[in-house]
């Protein structure tokens, strides 16, 4: 799946994992792939970041080709 992050940069590599981490008062999502890590988005709470992560995996299970981060 292709992922468009909040800056609308496209991630075209197969990712190994998606991480949720806290930076200051925000929670960030990042994709880890062979060769690096790409920032996906910033959210005001852990619950919101987790909702987005679940939505992304639902899109993958529907075999959608592109997912745009909210």
Task: Give the residues covered by each predicted segment.
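Eukaryotic intrinsically disordered, low-complexity regulatory linkers and tails enriched in Ser/Thr/Pro
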Residues: 1-70
């Amino acid at each position: 799946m292709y992922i468009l992050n909040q800056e609308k940069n496209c991630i075209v590599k197969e990712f190994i994992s998606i991480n949720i981490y806290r930076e200051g008062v925000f929670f960030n999502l990042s994709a880890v792939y062979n060769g690096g890590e790409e920032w996906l988005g910033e959210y005001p709470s852990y619950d919101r970041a987790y909702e987005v992560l679940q939505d992304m995996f639902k899109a993958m299970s529907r075999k959608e080709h592109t997912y745009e981060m909210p």
